[in-house]
Amino acid sequence: RHGQSEWNLENKFTGWVDVELAPQGKLEACKAGEFIKKLNLEIKHFYTSYQLRSIDTLKLILNTIRVKPNNIIKAWQLNERHYGSLTGLKKDEMKKKLGEDEVHKFRRSWDNPPKPLNINSPYHPKNISIYNDIPRNLIPDTESLKDTYERVVSYFVENIEKNLQDNIIISAHGN
């Protein structure tokens, strides 16, 4: 999982919004790199989501282990779960507004996504330039855990599984 982000610090639902690592997150990434370095592994494959917090986590790890790969694969399918209309909102405030049970249901139930994010929101992935190369019909407005699982596992099976005989780093999210 990527290091702590700025919105993790603010206790906000992040989803597909591109937020930076917090100072603590940068430290966590470097510590992960130190751990990997001690293992003295030859890592052949590198994957990350499209999101800056995962990309920067991977870069900090690679800098720490002194590896400069030319084969980093960025895959939007490895992105965090899309939290729909909860995106950008503070978790504690939403618990007060909707009730703890309702927020828990959106966060942890298997197939119950939050309400879709309004297409006009600046947080909607269709309005964020890093997603311009993704076909519009593939960009979600919200996701359940099941939707996220299917997206990530499908990508893993089709693209990563064939490389499991090698050492791999995947810098992604804790869905």
State where each predicted segment sits:
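Residue-level signal for short, function-critical loop segments
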Residues: G3, L78, G174
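Active-site-adjacent alpha-helix immediately C-terminal to a catalytic or transition-state-stabilizing loop
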Residues: I55, N63-T64, P69, K146-N175
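Phosphate-coordination/substrate-recognition cap region in phosphate-metabolizing enzymes
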Residues: C30-P125, Y131, E158
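Beta-strand elements within well-structured catalytic alpha/beta cores of enzymes
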Residues: R1, Y47, I73, N167-A172
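Extended, histidine- and acidic-residue-enriched regions that form the cofactor-binding/catalytic faces
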Residues: D111, N132, N137, D141-T142
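Short helix/loop segment immediately N-terminal to the Walker
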Residues: N120-H124, N137, K162-N167
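Loop-to-helix element that buttresses phosphate recognition and phosphoryl-transfer chemistry
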Residues: Q4-L60, T64, L138-S154
